[in-house]
Swiss-Prot record:
Signal peptide: none annotated. It comes from Methanosphaerula palustris (strain ATCC BAA-1556 / DSM 19958 / E1-9c). The keyword ATP-binding does not apply. Coiled coil: none annotated. Residues 56-290 form the Radical SAM core domain. It comes from the Archaea. Keywords: 4Fe-4S, Iron, Iron-sulfur, Metal-binding, S-adenosyl-L-methionine, Transferase. One of its GO terms (molecular function) is 5-amino-6-(D-ribitylamino)uracil--L-tyrosine 4-hydroxyphenyl transferase activity. This is 5-amino-6-(D-ribitylamino)uracil--L-tyrosine 4-hydroxyphenyl transferase. Belongs to the radical SAM superfamily. CofH family. InterPro entries: Aldolase_TIM, CofH/MnqC-like_C, CofH_family, Elp3/MiaA/NifB-like_rSAM, F420, FO_synthase_su2, rSAM. It catalyses: 5-amino-6-(D-ribitylamino)uracil + L-tyrosine + S-adenosyl-L-methionine = 5-amino-5-(4-hydroxybenzyl)-6-(D-ribitylimino)-5,6-dihydrouracil + 2-iminoacetate + 5'-deoxyadenosine + L-methionine + H(+). Catalyzes the radical-mediated synthesis of 5-amino-5-(4-hydroxybenzyl)-6-(D-ribitylimino)-5,6-dihydrouracil from 5-amino-6-(D-ribitylamino)uracil and L-tyrosine.
């Protein structure tokens, strides 16, 4: 019987020859321990260089979280509030437009907005907010909503999700967030986000968005109660969608922030992913998602030092400047508000690479 190291060498050699990684093979990579993780990271970095080149990219963006009031009770969330809780906010039209105008004055090219599911929101609420933003910041790329918000708006308004997406696009939606994916395995979803749309509904709405010319990101939230096999299944679902639609702009792994979350306090989740897992998530994703050009590391979730390591394990993008971020902060993250491009450049140059500013759709600025 071949040793694990021999198996790994053979598999990585096959990948260089054009072999497409299978789910069982991806699972083997996720289960790797010891110095072999560096071998996987190096192979992923070579793939990154071949697919995306050497530049480390970023987008100048600003986040707007409109409200933290939410009808859902996702176990992984430390951001949402219920009626009567302390600290509830809902930004007015004036406040939202002030934030959008500020973003425009900062030279931001993208405004990103995803919020709680406000009990009074309808599809028209989202559409109206998008009009406010694009009115205050004309020409901005609005990266907003996600399949859960689309489904919620449709249900509240008696509309189809296709009608909601069409209305959002007409109001200025340029691309959609691929969040609310978490782990696309329903038994896991029942534990961490009971009440959210099931896997097949998330997939359907993503495909629908792509069919309407609305590109989306793709995400995974890992490091809680899922297994390595669950992670592989999730990646396989994303790869199959991309084979069909080519509508994903990037893959963004989101490491679970545990500190202030119900599932951690209740003993249903562990204390987040380890550094080994963070590194392998980027590397295995680069090797498995062979139809994705761009893989991002989240400095918000992992901190800048771990994010830098991800850039030599298959990632090519550092995400955005953000300016403000409430969801990860609510869960206990400390690196959430703003990352200066000068610091991004220092990180990139430390690896012998150059920083390049991009648009949301990865055109270079």
């Amino acid at each position: 019987m071949r040793t694990m190291n021999h198996d790994l060498q053979g598999l990585l050699s096959d990948l260089k020859g054009g072999h497409r990684l299978g789910e069982d093979e991806a699972l083997m990579l996720f289960e790797t321990r010891g110095r072999d993780i560096w071998t996987i990271a190096a192979a992923a970095d070579e793939r990154r260089e071949a697919v995306a080149g050497d530049p480390v990219t970023y987008v100048r963006n600003q986040n707007i979280n409109v409200t933290n009031l939410c009808v859902n009770a996702c176990g992984f969330c430390g951001f949402s509030k219920k009626p009567g809780d302390d600290g509830i906010y809902y930004h007015s039209r004036e406040e939202i437009q002030q934030k959008a105008a500020l973003a425009k004055s900062r030279g931001v090219s993208e405004i990103c907005t995803v919020s709680g599911l406000h009990p009074h929101f309808t599809a028209e609420s989202y559409i109206e907010i998008y009009r406010w933003i694009t009115e205050a910041a004309p020409g901005i790329h609005l990266h907003a909503s996600n399949p859960m918000e689309v489904a919620y708006g449709a249900e509240r308004s008696g509309m189809t999700t296709r009608e909601v997406l069409t209305g959002m696009k007409a109001a200025g939606l340029s691309s959609m967030c691929g969040t609310a994916a978490e782990i696309l395995v329903d038994p896991v979803r029942d534990t961490i986000c009971r009440g959210k749309i099931p896997t097949d509904e998330w997939v359907r709405i993503i495909r629908e968005a792509h069919s309407l010319g609305i590109p989306t990101t793709a995400t995974i939230m890992y490091g809680h109660c899922e297994t390595e096999a669950d992670r592989v299944r999730h990646l396989a679902i994303l790869r199959a969608i991309q084979d069909e639609t080519h509508g994903f702009t990037e893959f963004v792994p989101l490491s679970f922030i545990h500190m202030n979350t119900p599932i951690y306090r209740q003993g249903l989740a562990r204390a987040g992913a380890t550094g080994r897992e963070d590194l392998l998530m980027v590397a295995v994703a680069r090797l498995f998602l062979d139809n994705f050009r761009n893989i991002q590391v989240s400095w918000v979730k992992e901190g800048i030092k771990m994010a830098q390591l991800g850039l030599i394990a298959g990632a090519n993008d550092l995400g955005g400047t953000m300016y403000e971020e409430s969801i990860s902060k609510g869960a206990g993250a400390t690196n959430t508000d703003y990352l200066d491009p000068a610091e991004m450049q220092r990180v990139a140059e430390d690896l012998g690479r150059m920083l390049e500013r991009r648009t949301t759709l990865y055109d270079m600025c």
